[in-house]
Amino acid sequence: MEVSEGSVTVEVPEERHGASEGSGEGVFYNPVQELNRDITAAVLRTVSDDCDEYLDAMAASGIRSVRAAAAGYDVTACDIDDDAVALTRRNLDRNGVDGTVHHRNVNAHMHESAHDVVDLDPFGTPMAFADAAVRSAGEYLCVTATDTAPLCGAHFESGVRSYDAVPRNTEFHAEMGLRVLLSALVRTAARHDIAAEPVLSHVTSHYVRTYLRVDSGARAADALLEHLGYIDHCQRCLWRDHERGRVPDPTTTCPHCGQSTWTAGPVWLGPAHDAAFVDDVAGAIPDSFGTADKARDLLSTVATELHQPTHYDQHKLYKRWNEPNIAMDDFLAALRAAGHEASRTHYGGTTFKTDADVADIRNAVE
């Protein structure tokens, strides 16, 4: 079958929804990831003045490679699947664009070759490729993770094993997954004296996607490590707190309701995006992209999110309070009127961030 994205048309063997249907056998095309690919294409447009070379680390159908090549990038693609290599070459040819396609283990390739932009889009965890990727990426590292259950703590042991962190399955589980992933990537880069700083991140349709600007130097890496720390969370009243540091000093009892608390970490507590960069990416999305409106809406919300490391769900708070909820706009206005910062988030229509704690939130909206 044929599919079109952006300005390219490619041959794909079958559609499969990735995380929801499993990796399956052989090469497949995931239509749910079109938003991911559209935003990636916009990122490549945004950074094109500084970047020329793009590595598609898991080529599959080659659609990422073809779109990058059509944008003027010097493209290299890797895959260990014979069919994927052949299909990627055909799709480059049919679109009249150039690219080098390697049939080899991408870790071996990344250890030997540098690229301005490295794009990791595996099925499952990206951590098996992270060490090689941070060394190969000269300017930007783009990473997808589809193993959201381990990342958010729903599959606890797998999350600990894959990300060397304690994830917790909280009501802000999507952001928990993002911050566990960012922590693992930042720590991996720092081991190689590389600073990997997130400039755009989102959690959409059972996957986490982040873009990190990379720079070499132990001091820069050390500075980013200062943004690692731990989150304490109460499952009963939804109180939470966070503390930066390498060694956890957990609050074991909730100061608000007395319930025993959970501690997660080390997680990334710093900004997950750079608002100016996100705005530039949104401005680089043309109307011809299939998910243009959705991508712009998503990025608009991401750009205005506060940098607090956790978000709340308004409906879940009101459920705990056993009260009917009010309109979100009125809710956020009440928080701001009480002197607090507040913003919507991209994690859901009733999610928000604020610098207020649970008690202050309730006082502000009563």
UniProtKB/Swiss-Prot annotation:
S-adenosyl-L-methionine binds at residues 37, 64, 79. The keyword Transferase applies. The keyword tRNA processing applies. CDD domains: AdoMet_MTases. It is an enzyme of class 2 (transferase). One of its GO terms (biological process) is tRNA N2-guanine methylation. InterPro entries: SAM-dependent_MTases_sf, Trm1, TRM1_arc_bac, tRNA_met_Trm1_C. Residues 1-28 are annotated as: Disordered. Pfam families: TRM. Residues 1-365 form the Trm1 methyltransferase domain. It catalyses: guanosine(26) in tRNA + 2 S-adenosyl-L-methionine = N(2)-dimethylguanosine(26) in tRNA + 2 S-adenosyl-L-homocysteine + 2 H(+). Zn(2+) binds at residues 234, 237, 254, 257. Its EC number is 2.1.1.216. Signal peptide: none annotated. One of its GO terms (molecular function) is tRNA (guanine(26)-N2)-dimethyltransferase activity. Keywords: Metal-binding, Methyltransferase, RNA-binding, S-adenosyl-L-methionine, Transferase, tRNA processing, tRNA-binding, Zinc. Dimethylates a single guanine residue at position 26 of a number of tRNAs using S-adenosyl-L-methionine as donor of the methyl groups. Belongs to the class I-like SAM-binding methyltransferase superfamily. Trm1 family. This is tRNA (guanine(26)-N(2))-dimethyltransferase. It comes from Natronomonas pharaonis (strain ATCC 35678 / DSM 2160 / CIP 103997 / JCM 8858 / NBRC 14720 / NCIMB 2260 / Gabara) (Halobacterium pharaonis).
